[in-house]
């Protein structure tokens, strides 16, 4: 039996959906004000009850800015205290394992914004997003970054972070 020579079809290139940021519209008057204020000036302090979308809004506006191609910022840096607000006891593991507990909201937001459950990991690999804790921010200068200070509860941590900002940054403070 002779083998038929089949033409090989060229490989199809799949463009990852993750590079496309979902369009988000403000849902409330307060969110409209936040959108407008950020677009006029690069610094915002957002406060509100739990579940009002502060972190989601900040991350969306930060990604929108970075992906516009007009921003001097190269990445988003999320800074958060990992001191538990309720005593949950000792968390075993190394630094990365301890911090991973606090990453879940950001992973979920990235998955929703990009329509890809692996968006956070891809953004980290591309060095477009970074997570730091207030415990390890000393000695670091946050250059060319949009900084999101999440769960800002301590005045001490806030003043400590202010000395870490470099050139061409935007800051979101979320209470």
Predicted regions mapped to residue ranges:
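Conserved RecA-like ASCE ATPase "motif II neighborhood" in helicase/translocase motors
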Residues: 127-148, 153
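Conserved P-loop
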Residues: 47, 56-124
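The conserved Walker
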Residues: 50
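Single conserved hydrophobic/aromatic residue that forms the stacking wall/gate
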Residues: 155-175
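Pre-Walker A (Motif I) flank of P-loop NTPase domains
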Residues: 40-45, 144
């Amino acid at each position: 039996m002779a083998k038929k020579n089949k033409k090989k079809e060229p490989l199809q290139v799949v463009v990852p959906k993750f590079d496309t940021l979902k369009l988000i519209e403000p849902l409330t008057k307060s969110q409209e004000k936040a959108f407008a204020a950020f677009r006029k000036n690069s610094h915002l302090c957002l406060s509100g009850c739990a579940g009002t979308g502060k972190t989601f809004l900040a991350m969306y506006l930060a990604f929108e800015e970075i992906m516009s191609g007009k921003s001097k910022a190269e990445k988003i840096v999320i800074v958060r205290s990992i001191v538990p607000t309720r005593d949950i006891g000792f968390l075993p593991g190394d630094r990365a394992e301890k911090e991973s507990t606090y990453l879940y909201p950001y992973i979920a937001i990235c998955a929703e914004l990009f329509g890809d459950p692996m968006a956070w990991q891809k953004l980290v690999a591309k060095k477009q997003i970074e997570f730091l804790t207030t415990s390890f921010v000393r000695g670091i200068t946050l250059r060319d970054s949009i900084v999101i200070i999440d769960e800002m509860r301590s005045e001490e941590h806030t003043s400590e972070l202010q000395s870490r900002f470099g050139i061409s940054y935007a800051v979101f403070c979320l209470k």
